[in-house]
């Protein structure tokens, strides 16, 4: 049986994700962000609910990306996720993209020219953000064209880099329905952005989200729930440069900006520059929120849930892979567990996120 990996946030899970799972082949293993997202935002609903939604709509196994993989720039996010999926025996990686191109060809380009491509990045002016530099690199070395906001396409290029030398097949699937950042409600396949924007429109949500009750009946989290905690951390911290990726310039900008900022958007807008993108600033503010220092990654792989078919695959791996199915007195990943505790502070109805939790088990492969 083909084993397909999918890297996801499911923030939240929606019909477009269901389409991706239905289109992908074989047994599907999801490497999913935990309670904080790649662009530096708290998850709308917690990781256990999102895992359950995925397992009820075509996923066979859901594993958790550690905090220092989840909350990273595209290249590190892709590398960390693919490393985990390869340990779980994937043969191919499926992903949605705005532009279906020959990603396999791009893997070969990077395998042959990675040193030259990396060296080229260092020649570009510092006024460009890293994503802008990366786009120029792919344009020069592989002729890739970019148009508009295509975040999934850019992630696909990061997947190509991370797949070099790993002998896995990349399987791009054309994104259906609304564009990634679209707030348009007039789509059966509405975007996650539109769903987050219209959470109070239950009719829209029920048509856009499979098992919509899981979304509707659980706390909806955003930066608004954590901004006061963040403000305390910034004002009370004696040396922000001890936080991961915070340099002197950013520390100064953040310390000044927090005094006049009433919400996260104002703070991000005030701190961001051409060099420091808004996504990067949001990630750094997330690092400050959870007091993240130098990154370390766990050896174990945390299993959030599985179906009967997924369980059979895990049984084949358990003797040769460090699979974690319950976090007890011995920690899995200290940073992720600390981030979970802070996430839980945002709402009294969020249950324990780490200690004692066991995987979600769906006995029937698919419950639509």
UniProtKB/Swiss-Prot annotation:
Pfam families listed in its UniProt record: HIGH_NTase1
Family statement: Belongs to the TmcAL family.
Binding site for ATP: 7-20, 96, 152, 175
Domain of life: Bacteria
Cell compartment(s), UniProt: Cytoplasm
Annotated source species: Streptococcus pyogenes serotype M49 (strain NZ131)
Gene for this chain: tmcAL
GO molecular function: ATP binding; ligase activity, forming carbon-nitrogen bonds; tRNA binding
Catalysed reaction equations from the record: cytidine(34) in elongator tRNA(Met) + acetate + ATP = N(4)-acetylcytidine(34) in elongator tRNA(Met) + AMP + diphosphate
Any single Gene Ontology cellular-component annotation: cytoplasm
One annotated GO biological process: tRNA modification
InterPro entries for this protein: Rossmann-like_a/b/a_fold, tRNA(Met)_cyd_acetate_ligase
Function, in words: Catalyzes the formation of N(4)-acetylcytidine (ac(4)C) at the wobble position of elongator tRNA(Met), using acetate and ATP as substrates. First activates an acetate ion to form acetyladenylate (Ac-AMP) and then transfers the acetyl group to tRNA to form ac(4)C34.
Chief place of localization: cytoplasm
Protein name according to UniProt: tRNA(Met) cytidine acetate ligase
The EC number(s) this enzyme carries: 6.3.4.-
PANTHER family linked: TRNA(MET) CYTIDINE ACETATE LIGASE
Keywords: ATP-binding, Cytoplasm, Ligase, Nucleotide-binding, RNA-binding, tRNA processing, tRNA-binding
The organism's taxonomic lineage, starting at the top: Bacteria, Bacillati, Bacillota, Bacilli, Lactobacillales
């Amino acid at each position: 049986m083909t084993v397909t990996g999918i890297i996801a946030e499911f923030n939240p899970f929606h019909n477009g994700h269901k389409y991706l799972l239905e289109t992908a082949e074989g047994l599907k293993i999801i490497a999913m962000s935990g309670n904080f997202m790649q662009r530096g935002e708290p998850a709308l609903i917690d990781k256990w609910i999102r895992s359950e939604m995925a397992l009820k709509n075509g996923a066979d196994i859901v594993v958790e990306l550690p905090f220092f993989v989840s909350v990273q720039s595209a290249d590190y996010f892709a590398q960390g996720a693919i490393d985990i999926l390869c340990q779980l025996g994937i043969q191919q990686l499926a992903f949605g993209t705005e532009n279906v191109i020959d990603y396999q060809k791009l893997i070969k380009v990077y395998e042959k020219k990675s040193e030259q491509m990396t060296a080229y990045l260092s020649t570009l002016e510092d006024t460009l953000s890293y994503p802008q530099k990366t786009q120029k690199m792919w344009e020069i070395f592989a002729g890739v064209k970019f148009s508009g906001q295509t975040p999934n396409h850019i992630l696909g290029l990061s997947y190509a880099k991370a797949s070099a030398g790993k002998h896995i097949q990349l399987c791009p699937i054309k994104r259906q329905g609304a564009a990634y950042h679209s707030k348009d409600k007039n789509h059966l396949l509405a975007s996650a952005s539109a769903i987050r924007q219209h959470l109070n429109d239950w009719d829209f949500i029920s048509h856009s989200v499979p098992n919509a009750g899981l979304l509707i009946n659980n706390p909806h989290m955003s930066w608004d729930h954590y901004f006061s905690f963040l403000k305390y951390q910034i004002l009370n911290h004696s040396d922000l440069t001890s936080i991961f990726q915070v340099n002197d310039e950013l520390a100064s900008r953040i310390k000044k900006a927090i005094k006049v900022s009433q919400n996260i958007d104002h703070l991000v807008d005030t701190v961001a520059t051409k060099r420091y993108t808004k996504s990067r600033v949001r990630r750094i503010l997330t690092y400050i929120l959870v007091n993240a220092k130098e990154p370390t990654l766990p050896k174990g792989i945390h299993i959030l849930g599985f179906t009967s078919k997924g369980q059979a695959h895990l049984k084949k791996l358990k003797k040769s892979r460090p699979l974690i199915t319950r976090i007890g007195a011995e920690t899995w990943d200290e940073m992720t567990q600390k981030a979970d505790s802070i996430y839980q502070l945002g709402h009294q109805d969020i249950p324990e996120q780490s200690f004692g939790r066991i995987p979600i088990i769906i006995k029937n492969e698919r419950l639509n």
